């Protein structure tokens, strides 16, 4: 299996988010959601650390409250704790620091559904560079197993279950909408 032409990566201009398209069995490219990409990365990272004997004691995965519960299933099935934070990498990084400084766990991966991924100890924020490197490494490893990333995603569904997702956008126009959003934000950050 060759990884050539099996996936396409794209980043935003400031390289903090990365998206991926994967070739399906019918030869077409499919855009993966941030949730799907995160689950693939989490499952791969867990397996890679287990295969190499580099899984830390008390391993942890972090996700935001709007990120798929499939991540929790992947983590807990493989012996990791999984914690939720509010949306935003500020909260993910704070939780990582708090857990690790207290000796309560070592975070191996953190993400949110909006295509942001935090790996390793290099950057305490979403980072498309380390994520792209890990996605490419993952694609190469699966190619060595005779699988594409699409095959790997389907295998994750078979192993952990099928999860649906739907994004809802609420529009609150005008001054009244601004007041409602502002009050909600203030209450959430008290």
Where are these regions (language model features)?
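Generic signature of intrinsically disordered, low-complexity segments enriched in small/polar residues
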Residues: 47, 120, 163-165, 188-189
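Mid-to-C-terminal polyanion-binding domains and interfaces
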Residues: 147, 151-187
